[in-house]
Amino acid sequence: MPVPSQPLPLHLDPLDPLLSTYHFVGIGGVGMSALAYILAKQGFRVSGSDIVANGRTRRLEALGVRFFQGHSSEGLVGDPQVVYSSAIRPTNPELAAALGKGLTVWHRADLLAALFNRRSGIGVAGTHGKTTTSSMIGYVLLSAGWDPTLIIGGEVDAWDGNARLGKGEYWVAEVDESDGSLVRLYPKIGVITNIELDHPDHYADLGQVIRAFQQYGQQSQTLVACLDCPNVAAHLRVDVGYSLTGHPQAQYQARQILYTASFTCAEIWEKGSLLGQLRLQVLGSHNLSNALAAVAVGRQLGLEFAVIASALAQFRGAHRRFEHKGEVGGVTFIDDYAHHPSEIRATLQAARLQQRRVVAVFQPHRHSRLAALFQDFARCFGEADVVVIVPTYGAGEPAPEGSDSLRLAVAVAEHHPHVRYVSSLPQLPEVLPSVLQPGDLAVFLGAGDLNQQIIATMRAYAAQVREQPGQAKNPNFS
């Protein structure tokens, strides 16, 4: 049941000093914490609650944000404006109390829109690649000295978090399509990386997804989009297109592409003229496409290609995007947020560049997604040598009868010779070391809590190889 809609007047400015106190219900989330950070950095009184503390809440506390662990109406000190996200249910005691008292209540997307739409906004939308692309654009503007404000859906070391408050003209925001709220933004430059069905809990079918992106594109003063995506090319009116495959209508193209285990290199062409060479530390064709979007945006803003290329050459990626977690006993451990079949394929293709045995460890995210895309999931692990599947992270959804993750393991095994099912996530550190071999690349895939088992697995594998001197390269797990 959704929270009752409370349309806010367009003239209501969230930065009005008379509206200076905010309380975020679910402040530890990546999107909520970013907005809380932006407001706190501007001197507004901010508080928030969540079930558990995390690195993001601790970062906010260092700014003076008051954090309440757990949800209680006692957190509504001084009748603040209350901010919630689609993850918060109407029965939440804080949200229910705020509605009962008639407090100003913002959906996160409404607050973002109220801040973003008043500025020169660059909004990055798409089913895949939003975090990396928005981070790349932000890094380019930061490197160019433009001092942008950044609201990103992931942690980035370059600005030590998921948000940055700048004094420059431009705001760069990752735009979430999961609940349809992307249609609330009106960017100066809108970016769409691709369009697929990824949130069947909100959209009935792909047609609904396409219509939401069409509206977002129409609301963008300039739409920059990837013409390699069939749904983009067929259904959107694109102002500035980019392509890795030579699409004839793409103003920006990557040619003479070289993918290696340590870098990606390509010639970048603009409207038929060679701009120069681009070299990236982040790997894979998906990241080259993301970088090409950043090139297109930078050029629309008037930046010289040399400035853009220099910044992108230094960009090291966002957390949980093929993030190197460590090496133990000759095994390299990688954390990646991929949770859609297309993302899994792209990540494993990048892993294959290492020319090592690839062990893919996958935690499905949301029962509804697994059910809607089941056959695609069953066939997306072709680049892995070994596939290990753990139980689905439900994200609050009711579990179906039986184990959908076990059914997935059986289905993957119809297309793949080496599949292992682990029936309990806490058992993974006990089971996975027996699968691993020196030289392996262990890639943990998923948007849930699988990543919390990586360090424990590294410790367990270190213990296993401790009797074999010379193998453990990082024996810092006692």
Curated annotation (Swiss-Prot):
Name listed for the protein in its UniProt record: UDP-N-acetylmuramate--L-alanine ligase
Protein role: Cell wall formation.
Species for this entry: Synechococcus sp. (strain JA-2-3B'a(2-13))
Phylogenetic lineage: Bacteria, Bacillati, Cyanobacteriota, Cyanophyceae, Synechococcales
Binding residues annotated for ATP, in chain numbering: G126, T127, H128, G129, K130, T131, T132
Catalytic activity: UDP-N-acetyl-alpha-D-muramate + L-alanine + ATP = UDP-N-acetyl-alpha-D-muramoyl-L-alanine + ADP + phosphate + H(+)
Coiled-coil portions: none
Protein family according to the UniProt entry: Belongs to the MurCDEF family.
GO cellular component, one term: cytoplasm
GO biological process terms, semicolon-separated: cell division; cell wall organization; peptidoglycan biosynthetic process; regulation of cell shape
EC number: 6.3.2.8
GO molecular function terms attached to this record: ATP binding; UDP-N-acetylmuramate-L-alanine ligase activity
Subcellular location: Cytoplasm
Primary location: cytoplasm
Keyword ATP-binding set for record: yes
Protein keywords: ATP-binding, Cell cycle, Cell division, Cell shape, Cell wall biogenesis/degradation, Cytoplasm, Ligase, Nucleotide-binding, Peptidoglycan synthesis
Gene3D superfamilies hit by this protein: Mur ligase, C-terminal domain (3.90.190.20), Mur-like, catalytic domain (3.40.1190.10), NAD(P)-binding Rossmann-like Domain (3.40.50.720)
Pathway membership, UniProt: Cell wall biogenesis; peptidoglycan biosynthesis
InterPro entries, alphabetized: Mur-like_cat_sf (IPR036565), Mur_ligase_C (IPR004101), Mur_ligase_C_dom_sf (IPR036615), Mur_ligase_cen (IPR013221), Mur_ligase_N (IPR000713), MurCDEF_pg_biosynth (IPR050061), UDP-N-AcMur_Ala_ligase_MurC (IPR005758)
Class in the EC hierarchy, top level: ligase
